[in-house]
Amino acid sequence: MKQNEDSLLREKLKEYFGFSSFKGNQEAVIRNVLSGKDTFVLMPTGGGKSLCYQLPALLMDGVAIVISPLIALMKNQVDAMRTYSNDAGIAHFLNSSLNKSAVAQVRNDVLEGRTKLLYFAPESLTKEDNVAFLRKVKVSFYAIDEAHCISEWGHDFRPEYRRIRPIINEIGTAPLIALTATATPKVQMDIQKNLGMSDASVFKSSFNRPNLYYEIRPKHDVDREIIRYIKQHEGKSGIIYCLSRKKVEELTGGSVVVDVQASGVLGSENDVLD
């Protein structure tokens, strides 16, 4: 029987996402979600966390509520899900960027059963009209992405994340899956306690990246060293982290990096919420 179940799950993976096999703990996590149990996932960036709730959402009755901290992340995931389906209503997000007409269309798709994944920022989830709407909906499970934002001990603490559990209680309880790529044991305990999922099944993946190495060098004429290093690796891409916006602008504005294609991303550009 288990062999048939394994085969069926892989068939669905291939059908919906085009993959022939799962990565790491993905299959075990998905089975736990499908069984209706609370799930805590600690998995490195690039490990395939999103699939751990996307595939179960497609296979279960109802709509999965996905809570994510940034509009850009939600939009990217919704766009990606729509490429896997002929129905654009398969995934939606609800936030302040939508006008009344767009919100009405999203809610209609959800009520008609077309939508399997509905994304919210925590600030949007807590709005009274959204809570009232979701009370009418059959929720398959709740997925809390970037769950470290819940913990005051975490580096990206978001106060609204700590309101998620009370709001879930208002909407209607369902299994939870919390996912993060960064959580110390202390942060993990805080997440599980705050979400009321202390008995959750825990899945931890290895963070070892054999293709990466760390090297520490004394600082001597840093700008010259950066230029030399870039030119030694011609045709390749890299990321330079700076401690200030000013330094990013200096490096990418032409005063330091000469004859090198460069672009800068400032911290504030990633801080787009709700």
Where are these regions (language model features)?
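Conserved Rossmann-like nucleotide-cofactor binding loop
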Residues: 72
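Helicase motor core with emphasis on the C-terminal RecA-like subdomain
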Residues: 7-16, 20, 24, 28-40, ...
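Intrinsically disordered, low-complexity N-terminal extensions of nucleic-acid-metabolism proteins
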Residues: 1-2, 118
